[in-house]
Amino acid sequence: MADFIRTQIFGTCFEITSRYVDLNPVGMGAFGLVCSARDQLTNQNVAIKKIMKPFSTPVLAKRTYRELKLLKHLRHENLITLSDIFISPLEDIYFVTELLGTDLHRLLTSRPLEHQFIQYFLYQILRGLKYVHSAGVVHRDLKPSNILINENCDLKICDFGLARIQDPQMTGYVSTRYYRAPEIMLTWQKYDVEVDIWSAGCIFAEMLRGKPLFPGKDHVHQFSIITELLGNPPDDVIETIGSENTLNFVKSLPKRERIPLSQKFPNADPDAVDLLEKMLVFDPRKRINAADALAHPYLAPYHEPSDEPVASEKFDWSFNDADLPVDTWKVMMYSEILDFHNVDSSAVEQQQQQPQPPQPQLQQQQQPPQQPQQPQQPQXAQQPVQPVQGDYVPQVAPRS
């Protein structure tokens, strides 16, 4: 049986196996506290997320089970990877994943991003979403703080605690307001993978302008400022509104015409504006999907269809409608953890034997490039709890 060590972090007891040392707080994720640590077995830095009181209610137990199942199933270069999981003697659950140096929120609040970084980050976000959506999963909470980045500009989407089945009748109040798709505000029930594309579009716009595009104070103000830019929703979208109060609110809005995004982003690459126009569309049925967005001319320097994989099978959501007691969820959780430890070593071995796909060239330099045609790059963070800093000057190059 593994030895456990107790440490107090921000007044919270972290009870982890002795394999992990040098704990430092990173921040709060969805329903959990995250710390960085060093894995003595691999000598790699990792992130450890404590799921607080996972068995206190059936709802929390089910949510934790869902996140574990998703982390086990979703394996992609642009998604956070689960490397270990354990239940402590106090019956808290800990997810161990790779540690990246910073997140997109920290980068955006530190300085403007240069064009090639915006382009490469958006490509990786959409590459990850293409895979997630192909598995029948909707992230539902895509935002800059859920997009992790290392010093080599490798990007990974994290925090699948709110992810749900790909289902047009999903319900609930989800996603951070600034990045929330209008169909969520209009109906709160009928939405699908397109909500992630809207969120990615809002993130794309924020990278281009350096601040949120739709900083709503509440959901009414949020929807109002969306219409100030995109105009009133078309009639066929209004017809889908299920709530009478929401319908009356939308009809009461003043008549507004769509403003071309080229006016909002006068200095942006025309291809970037064109792609953004296709992502920020009121009607989710007409919104571009992840696969088509990857093929857009704006992302041509990185687009490689053979290196943009989809899931080999759909995620099994058969448990999602189950209404089970905590003890049953606990047994199911233990079963999943045992299964993870039984199969993970063979999966890693198999992955190591497979040839790695070609990656965009990212070079570590101590000084900016000397060629005049290559602009100086922003430095990426090396520490997860510090503002963006360090000696890295990554050079982003198109695929050869």
From Swiss-Prot:
The keyword Manganese does not apply. Pfam families: Pkinase (PF00069). Activated by tyrosine and threonine phosphorylation. The modification Phosphothreonine is found at T171. GO terms for cellular component: cytoplasm; nucleus. SMART domains: S_TKc (SM00220). The keyword ATP-binding applies. PANTHER family: MITOGEN-ACTIVATED PROTEIN KINASE. Belongs to the protein kinase superfamily. Ser/Thr protein kinase family. MAP kinase subfamily. HOG1 sub-subfamily. The TXY motif contains the threonine and tyrosine residues whose phosphorylation activates the MAP kinases. This is Mitogen-activated protein kinase hog1. It comes from Blastobotrys adeninivorans. The gene is hog1.
